[in-house]
Each structure stands twice: as C-alpha cells, then as structure tokens.
Amino acid sequence: MRIILIGRSDPTSCIPRLRVAGLLSELRAKDLAFSVAESAALLDTHGLRVDTADITQLHRRTEGWPAGLRLAALTIEQAEDVHTAVAQFTGSNHAVADYLFTEVIRGMPADLVEFLLATCAPEELDIGLARQLSGRQDAGQVLERLSRANALVLQMADPAVYRYHSILRTYLAAELTKRAPARLLRQHMVTADWLIGKPSYAAALSHSVASGDENHLVRLIERNGIRMIHSGKGGRLLAAAREAKLPLDRLPLIAAMAALAALDVGDLATADTVLAAHSHSAFDPRSTMLFRIAHVQRRMLGGDVISALDRTSMLSWARTGEPDLDLLMLVCRGSARLRPGDTAGAINDLTAALELATSLGHDETVLWTLSQLSGATGSACDFLGMQHWSNRAIEFARPRGWARSPRLAYAYLLAAWTGFQTGEIDSQSLYAQLAEEALGRHPNVEVELGVRSMAALAAFESSTGFGRYEAATHFHDLWQAPAAREVSPALTGFAVPQEVRLALSIGELTWARDAAARVAGRFPGSAEALVLAAEVLAARGKNREALTILRRLRQDDVPVHVRTTLVAADVLAARLILAAGDRHGSLSRLIDAFDWADQRGFRRPFLDAGAWLAELIATSTGEFGRHERFAAQILQSLTDSDDSAGRPTSIVSPLTRRETEVLRDLPSQRYFDQIAQDYGVSVNTVKTHVASIYRKLGVTGRREAVLEARRIGLL
C-alpha cells in the first residue's frame, strides 16, 4: 500500500522516521516547478503566443510556480499588449494579490504577517538581518516555521539564509507601500548597510538607490566606493549614481569615484565628461588625489602618460595610510611607470600593490597586479620572472571563473610571448587567441597593441604562403596607428624588430625602412634604432655599412631600452661577419649572444636566423664551452624542418609583392604568357620576376622553386 500526502506544509508526525528509514519519497516545490519549455507549453494551452524573451522573463518572475504561471496566463489573456502584461506581472498584480491574500496571508497569525511585511525588502534574508529588520530575536525560528509551512518561503543552501519567492516578496512590498511607504524605504536603507558589511556591494547599492535617500547613497559611496572599484563593482557604482541622478557637479568625491569606475569598465565617454567638468576646480586632498589618479589612468587608455605623470606629480607621492586609496595609487603608478621605461620602479610599486591587495582580499586587483608584474618583469627582460608571474595570474584566475577577464589579457600576452621567444608556436598561438578574447572594450593602449601585435605574429608563424603576407601586413598596419607612439620603450623594443622582420620576409623593404626610421625618431641614438638601421642596410646588401653601425653598440654611452636588442645585434653581426668569410669572428659574436641568452632561455633571434646559423653551430660543436647544451638546443630547433615549417630560412633576399604573387602561380601548369595576361604585363616581365625568384630561393628551375617555397613556408 502507498500513502500519498499532499500539503503546503510538512506534516509534523512520522515524517522524520520515514525519511530516516528510507521509506519516504518527497516532491518539493522545486521539483514541481515548471521549466521554461513547460511554461511555454502552459501558455500555449491558453492559445497565447508569447515570444521567447517574455517567456523567459515570466519564468524568472514566477520561478516556475504553477499557480503563478496560471495567473499570468489569465492576466495576459485579458491584456491588450502581451509584452506590457509580462513586464507588469508581479505580486502587485490584482489577480496575484487576491490569490496570495486568500491562499497564503489570510490564514496566518497577525504576528507572522507583520514579520513578512517587515522583512520583504531583501532578496535574500540572513537571520541576523531579519532580527534587525523585524526587531524579533526569534527571527531564525520564525523563518524556519514559515519555510516549513509555506512553499513560498525558501531556505537556501546556507541554513542561516532564507528567501521569499519573488511573487510573494513583490506582493508584500506593494502591500507595505500602501500601508506605510516610509517603512519599506527604511528597510532598503537598513538592508544596504547590512550588505555593505558582508560585503555585497552590488546589492547594497541597489537597496540604497531603492531607499530614495540621496544622502544615504552618497555616504555609502564615499565610504566604500574605492573598495567597490577594487572588487570589480565599478560598473554598478556608476549605474547607481545614474539611477539616483546624483548631482556630480556638487559632489567632487563621488564624481572622482564615478570617473574611476567609468574607466574601470571602459566607459571612456562618461569618464571624459566627468573629468572635463572638474578639470579646473579645487577639491579636498582625497578628491584631488582620486582625480589625478583618474587622469593618469585615462591617459593609459590613450594619451600622453609621461606628461600626465609630470602634471600630477604622482611619482613623488607617499602613502596616505588609507589602504584602499594607497592600493589604487600603487597599481596606477606601477602600471604607468612602464611607459617611460622605469621597470624597476614599476616592479617595486606593483609588488607592494600585490601584497596590499592580497591582504585586503581584493581578488580582482590581485589578478590585475599579477598580470602587470608579468609585463614589468618582461620589460626588464627577466623572462623567467615574466613566465612566473603570467602563470600565477592564469592559475589565480582559473578557479574563479575569470579566464576571459580583461584583467588577464596582459598575462595571456606575456604567456604568448614566452611561447614565441622559445619557439613553442602552438603555445604562442593558443595564448595569443586567449589574449584577444580577453580584451575589454577600451583596454590599456599598451595591452591592446601588444595583444593585437602578438595575434598577428602568431598568425604569421603558423601560416604559409599568402597567409603570411596578410599577417605581416596586419602587423605593419597596427604599428602605423597613433597609439603606437604612446606605448613603452620595452614594447617598442620587442615588437618593432618583428615588424621589420615580417616586412622584409614579404619583400616590403619600404615598410622596414619606415619602421626603423620611426624608432630612430622616438629613441635617437639608441641601440634599438641602430640595430634596426643595420637590419635594413643588410637587407639592401650593404653589409659593410651595417657592420659599421653595429660596432657603435660596443660604446658605453649607447642607451639600451631592452637588453634583447644587444643579443639580436650580436646575431646579425655574426651573420654579416660570416658572409665576409670570417668564421672565427662570427663564432665569437655568436658566443657573445649566447652569454646573455643562455641563462635566460632567450631563443628568438637564433630561431629567426635560419640555415646559416644551423650550419655554423653544426660545424662548431665543442667550441661553445658552457653553452654547448644551449647551442645544441638551438640547432635541434633549426633542423626540425618538419616541426618548424614556415620558419625563416636561408632565402638570400626577400621576395617583392609581385614576386610573391607570381610564385603562387608556379605550382600550376600554366604558361608564362597566361600568367602575364592575368597580371596585365609582358611575358618578359614575368620571366624577369621568375628569374629573380629562382635566384632568391637558390634554385634553377620551376619545380625546385615550388618545392623550396613549400619547404620554407612561402607556399
């Protein structure tokens, strides 16, 4: 025999014993709740055609409660506009209110009804908050009793937290508004103060706005606004200020926080409006400091960061003793220091910021700081440190569900750079893609240009044929943008040599020359400018002039922005010296390059060198001293042609754009006159291009040219 009991509350007798004995099957309200599809089917039985968005909203409002859905169907049937009826379907709806009063409220003792009315504002009701709102010390017992007696009062996973069904809660709020509206507003205020202590910033802001008390919201933001920004709630702070129509022109501290919040979520238009409105005003010290931080942060999203640092005197600021404000300053200043190339200062500020953010429990700021530290150590050419910090950032983000957070984009970029400089192309490609996916709407200029450049570089390394030409073109275009003049010396020092390499690989000598001139204009007399000038001269066959320039790097007074530049210079010098017939001199310069690169695992310039370096290493085994193992690793990478298809090779001179186009026609069986007709040129012109292709590839015939071009990734 089976006994079925149906009721809105648990029977008090025998149920616990049956449950323990395993003789009881229970179907609770959540088991009987309709799914979205079932809700749609119910409406369909009433002949109602409701779109997916409205069905979803209705299901969210009713939480699948069958009676609520039935009432909604009856309401929609009588409505002129379905969308409006759904939007207005809450506990204040007449049909719903009548049902709840008749079926739920009327049979309750007066003290329980009063308790429900006194605690209806919060979406989730902590027992402590219930005590404070109701004034009843037995609030926990009351809530437990209500949850047992009524399916519309739910106990959460945390047994100390309850929730009223949204329909019941909106009914109670509407009823309280009719009886004593000030009580409901007071509830929102008390709830906001309670939630701030949890902390639950977004919900606290919502309740403060709902209280209608501007002074309360202002105090809440003034005391907690910086903390909200550190916790990733800047967007909610900004929305609350808008909803409440706070007069920012009369509230400088709130205005400064609103500007910082807008910058945090990439709302540059709002940030610019607020900053412009307060650009010539005098404020209290705290507001002034926040506005100055906002000005520097705005410049980091596009503008002259170095001038902003000078105008704000931020580099000389001492700590204030207010932890959240100090953290904001350290993170901003640490990131900004990278623009003028102050990597040591950046690392000091960011290390202090990481310690402070960790102690304060601001995980979002911890993630940002870890990412920035990976960039700062990378700028200092500490590649092991860079890998350490980027890995820490990625590992920190993963369990928190932040794998696509814009705060992680920089760490992904540096992880991709690690893969690039070590020759791990699959890793480079993966992290370059993740970095692009993580970019926000208006990211830091340095981060965005770095990420976009890395994506183009990854596409170049993993492509063959015309795909390489497209990737190189995209890389070139990125560095023509005005933002390229705003990035740090480190990013310029790492990226522009790749711009030159890619340009030369597709025959765009003019692009390479322009890139070298750009660096010379920004960093005149620097090692970076000299090496790029030498690269361009070497590409034009002017090896002697290139070597003359490279010798100047041995002078002590040549400024160096990234130490890797000198490694690249030694590798280039080794190639040119070898081409002049001096094997011993070439080997000596190569060992100079190994001296710095070996202990740091820096391989990229050697991987870019190609066949001449492979041959030099292979014929010099035993001559590298403590670098024998490193030399063997480089040789292995260079000779693994199957695994490195598409890497730079021994091509004597880069192909021009037209030669690249003609090369793509060579695998076909078409005659030269047919190819000439396609391009609108003479047969002799095509033959001239083909002869140049053969010479540059070091082959003597069409079939050999195709095979060699495929081997080196040009096809």
Where are these regions (language model features)?
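Helix-turn-helix DNA-binding segment
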Residues: 636-639, 643-691, 695-697, 704-715
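Alpha-helical sensor/transducer elements of the RecA-like P-loop NTPase core
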Residues: 1-61, 66-75, 80, 95-97, ...
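Single-residue signature of alpha-solenoid repeat helices
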Residues: 204, 271, 308, 346, ...
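Short coil/turn linker motifs that delimit alpha-helical repeat modules in TPR/alpha-solenoid proteins
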Residues: 157, 180, 197, 213, ...
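Extended alpha-helical scaffolding segments used for macromolecular assembly and cargo binding
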Residues: 179-265, 270-274
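Amphipathic alpha-helical segments of tetratricopeptide repeats
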Residues: 148, 225, 272-282, 312-321, ...
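Tandem amphipathic alpha-helical repeat scaffolds
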Residues: 218-227, 253-266, 287-305, 325-343, ...
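C-terminal boundary/linker of central alpha/beta nucleotide-binding cores
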Residues: 8-9, 14-17, 53-55, 97-175, ...
